[in-house]
Amino acid sequence: MGLWRGKSPLILASQSSARKMLLANAGLEFIAITADIDERGIQAASKLSSPRDIGLLLAREKAKAVSANHPGSHVIGADQTLALGERLFNKPAGRAQAMAQLRDLAGNYHELNSAVAVAHDGKIVFEDVSVARMTMRQMSEAELSAYLDAAGDAVTTSVGAYQLEGLGIHLFERIEGDHFTILGLPLLPLLAFLRSEQLIAV
């Protein structure tokens, strides 16, 4: 018997391999369903400027969008934003944009904001944002090119053009924050909420 005690299946509103891995490693059975939302459109319409607030808004919208079609289920939405000062980064569209992002991040400190929201019957019942502070080492053009050659198309799937669970770890000299936040899901506060609602057995 698994840990999930909800009457309806737990749903992750994401196909992120890292988020799916984190939930699976925590012993939770779940269904992964992509949230069909216009992230850029929602962000623009909101007129929010804080990376933290934008991440939380998108996590909420993902959870609510999937929840609307799955009554009774608890739906987890998550989003991650990267901020270099006041500048917000999006996933790079290709290699050239990935290189430009890495040039800006190299030798500098930035923040990863990981937001999570849980929806039930279309309403948000839990939300949280965790922050990781990241310092990327100074790198030459040759080093950045070598990284992009090795990482391939995977760089376009993450903000900042790096995946810390893979080759991206080579880019950093200092990381402050928990592993789950860096991978895009504040797992400890999420589990605490599920436990408080008696939705998990442990």
Curated annotation (Swiss-Prot):
Q: Which GO terms describe its molecular function?
A: nucleoside triphosphate diphosphatase activity
Q: Which GO terms describe its biological process?
A: nucleotide metabolic process
The answer to whether UniProt assigns keyword Membrane to this entry is no
- Name what cofactor the protein needs: a divalent metal cation
Catalysed reaction(s) here are: a ribonucleoside 5'-triphosphate + H2O = a ribonucleoside 5'-phosphate + diphosphate + H(+); a 2'-deoxyribonucleoside 5'-triphosphate + H2O = a 2'-deoxyribonucleoside 5'-phosphate + diphosphate + H(+)
Please name the top-level EC class of this enzyme.
Answer: hydrolase
Q: Which UniProt keywords apply?
A: Cytoplasm, Hydrolase, Nucleotide metabolism
InterPro entries for this protein? ITPase-like_fam, Maf-like
What's the EC number here? 3.6.1.9
The cellular location(s) given in this protein's UniProt record come to: Cytoplasm
**Could you confirm whether the keyword Cytoplasm appears in this record?**
yes
Query: Where are the active-site residues found?
Result: D79 (proton acceptor)
Q: What CDD domains does the record tag this protein with?
A: Maf
| Entry similarity comment | Belongs to the Maf family.
Show the NCBIfam families listed in the entry. maf
Tell me what this protein is called. Nucleoside triphosphate pyrophosphatase
Q: Which organism is it from?
A: Bradyrhizobium diazoefficiens (strain JCM 10833 / BCRC 13528 / IAM 13628 / NBRC 14792 / USDA 110)
